[in-house]
């Protein structure tokens, strides 16, 4: 253990690479299988069976889909802006997959005398005896969410198709509106936790009640705004196929289309993980099972809720959507902040 | 400091490599039989009419501009929310003034109908 | 190691900002500008200012650039064709050289380096950058903070006046 690179022990680097790989594979598998789960769950809710042919009860469906998309023809429209058209899926995908870096997904484990916090962007500082993570963890996630907009706006613009342009514009206006409301909704959480570090937010909930109980309004607002921000039903206006064909990804095919698809589901996983961490006590749960189990269970429950909502509600109309974001959610979040401020300081 | 940020760099690298690999391999593996019609923008199977590079509603700009302004408000709220218990009633008052002034702007925007989509 | 990392990020930042002014396609210029903001954010992180880094991405790359991209799309700016007029090249380089000269002059005089601040990395790591910024903003700089809200109010009214035909 004596060997050090840049002031950090070798064990740190091994643990880091392992954590990164485990989380990346976890997100990738969850993304792949939530597409399957979504088809299956909605199928059963609508008294259908969903995919049944590939593998036992269609279990190999995501793999078959992936392979199929790999072999599809790649079409780049002749009028498209090539560079922007190629880079747009990448800009959508990368922020969606790296959001997980700041989310704590389990308690600190000890391997061979070296303490490893189960959070990618964190390490155990032996000098202070504390887990050090990003001081601005929540802002990191918000910043990434604000970058995801470019993938969609560029895809819409560069395709040089009317449907794409309208879909891209609509969806970017929707995303920024709800990003704002989501960003304001979680401020009342920081007012209770007195920190933007996700480790501290989770620890604070373990000592008291979950923030979902202390801040029920913020919880509901944040979850709805997040669903709207990642363009899921009932707010999937950019993909309103009855009016916009397929929105911003009308002209996309093969793996580039799949990348938007993966980005959408990865965003859903990230949003559910953030909601778990901020409002549902993170990885804390009854002690008989390890922390990561509770974390995964809560995240999967929220993912299930997203699918349930999709099966239940019809799509919003665009003017209703914008009215909801700007005229209902925005003032509600501000009122929630002021009320929390007055109650706490009295 | 390094210990907390280095993993993010590694994760970014992995995500970028994953994305690039998907792009490159799918374009290598997939068949390519381009034709003029196939590469034309999709318009329900008809000949595309006019250009897609047209001006669009000014609504989107006002949303983008208002987003910047209220986002800055949110940015001011983050450090305040972390500190507000330590600032006490004084902190609530000063942020109250800030929010009320911006709320006046919000009401102005509402009354002028800038948030209407018809 | 830290210097080496700084060199790489700074080189990318400079390259990206050169691309901003040389790209023929305005959207590519905007993308380069976003990359420049990212490099700046990375530099803020290496300077122990994570809050600044997050705000840099959140406000500049995530909000202001969205508006700029929208405007590029609205104005339907075509790819710039042909050469720029020789006048603008001449004046541009003259102004650039003058600014460079000014910078060198200032650095040589080093009249800018005043006292060192009291906040160092150790304090930031202990208290937290967000907390330190908040403490300064909401106690020492209270008036500028409240004035900011009036500035934002003016900007909100300006945005409405600019975009509405009938007020």
UniProtKB/Swiss-Prot annotation, chain B:
Biological function: NDH-1 shuttles electrons from NADH, via FMN and iron-sulfur (Fe-S) centers, to quinones in the respiratory chain. The immediate electron acceptor for the enzyme in this species is believed to be ubiquinone. Couples the redox reaction to proton translocation (for every two electrons transferred, four hydrogen ions are translocated across the cytoplasmic membrane), and thus conserves the redox energy in a proton gradient.
PANTHER family: NADH-QUINONE OXIDOREDUCTASE SUBUNIT A, NADH-UBIQUINONE OXIDOREDUCTASE CHAIN 3
Reaction catalyzed: a quinone + NADH + 5 H(+)(in) = a quinol + NAD(+) + 4 H(+)(out)
Record flagged with keyword Cell inner membrane: yes
GO cellular component, one term: plasma membrane
Top-level taxon of origin: Bacteria
Taxonomic lineage: Bacteria, Pseudomonadati, Thermodesulfobacteriota, Desulfuromonadia, Geobacterales
Pfam families per the UniProt record, alphabetical: Oxidored_q4
Subunit-structure text: NDH-1 is composed of 14 different subunits. Subunits NuoA, H, J, K, L, M, N constitute the membrane sector of the complex.
Transmembrane segments: 5-25, 60-80, 87-107
Membrane association type: Multi-pass membrane protein
UniProt entry keywords in alphabetical sequence: Cell inner membrane, Cell membrane, Membrane, NAD, Quinone, Translocase, Transmembrane, Transmembrane helix, Transport, Ubiquinone
GO molecular function: NADH dehydrogenase (ubiquinone) activity; NADH:ubiquinone reductase (non-electrogenic) activity; quinone binding
InterPro entries the UniProt entry points to: NAD(P)H_OxRDtase_bac/plastid, NADH_UbQ/plastoQ_OxRdtase_su3, NDAH_ubi_oxred_su3_sf
Family label: Belongs to the complex I subunit 3 family.
Protein name in UniProt: NADH-quinone oxidoreductase subunit A 2
EC class name: translocase
UniProt subcellular location: Cell inner membrane
E.C. numbers: 7.1.1.-
